Curated annotation (Swiss-Prot):
Pfam family for this entry, one: Iron_traffic
UniProt similarity note: Belongs to the Fe(2+)-trafficking protein family.
Domain of life assignment: Bacteria
GO MF annotation list: iron ion binding
Name of the protein in its database record: Probable Fe(2+)-trafficking protein
Task performed by this protein: Could be a mediator in iron transactions between iron acquisition and iron-requiring processes, such as synthesis and/or repair of Fe-S clusters in biosynthetic enzymes.
Record's keyword terms, sorted: Iron
Classification via InterPro entries: Fe_traffick_prot_YggX, Fe_traffick_prot_YggX_sf
UniProt source species: Stenotrophomonas maltophilia (strain R551-3)
C-alpha cells in the first residue's frame, strides 16, 4: 500500500516516496513532504544542472551547489535553468 503525503512542491496530496532519498534531516524532510512525481521532476532538473554546468557529484563544492538547488527546487520554487540553457526541439 502506498503512502500519501501533502506534497509541498505540487501543493496537493500525492503518492509518497517509498524510501528516504537523501541523507540526514533534508532526506527526512523530502520523505515527509515530497511526492514521487515531484522527486522525479527534481531528478530530471538535477541531471540538467549536472550536464549543463559540467558538475561532478564527487566534488564537495558541486554537491553543496546541488543540495542548495534541491532545496530551492522542491521547497522554495526558486530554481532556475542554467544560463544559456535551450531545450532540444
Amino acid at each position: 500500500m502506498s503512502r500519501t503525503v501533502f506534497c509541498q512542491y505540487e501543493q496537493r496530496d500525492a503518492e509518497g516516496l517509498d524510501f528516504v532519498p537523501y541523507p540526514g534531516e533534508l532526506g527526512q524532510r523530502i520523505f515527509n513532504n515530497i511526492g514521487k512525481q515531484a522527486w522525479a521532476a527534481w531528478l530530471a532538473h538535477q541531471t540538467m544542472l549536472i550536464n549543463e554546468n559540467r558538475l561532478s557529484p564527487r566534488t564537495p563544492e558541486h554537491r553543496a551547489f546541488l543540495e542548495g538547488e534541491l532545496v530551492k527546487f522542491l521547497f522554495e520554487k526558486d530554481a532556475e535553468k542554467p544560463a544559456g540553457f535551450t531545450p532540444e526541439a
